[in-house]
Amino acid sequence: QLTFTPGW
């Protein structure tokens, strides 16, 4: 599962 990560 891909989750939004600030900085990625």
From Swiss-Prot:
Chain positions found as Pyrrolidone carboxylic acid: 1
Its localization reads:
Secreted
| GO-annotated biological processes | flight behavior; neuropeptide signaling pathway
- Give the Tryptophan amide positions (modified residues): 8
- Tree of life domain: Eukaryota
- Give the record's keywords alphabetically: Amidation, Flight, Hormone, Neuropeptide, Pyrrolidone carboxylic acid, Secreted
**UniProt-listed InterPro entries:** Adipokinetic_hormone_CS (IPR002047)
Q: Which GO terms describe its cellular component?
A: extracellular region
Q: A GO molecular-function term, please?
A: hormone activity
Q: Which family does it belong to?
A: Belongs to the AKH/HRTH/RPCH family.
Function, in words: This hormone, released from cells in the corpora cardiaca, causes release of diglycerides from the fat body and stimulation of muscles to use these diglycerides as an energy source during energy-demanding processes.
Protein name from the UniProt record: Adipokinetic hormone
Organism of provenance: Tabanus atratus
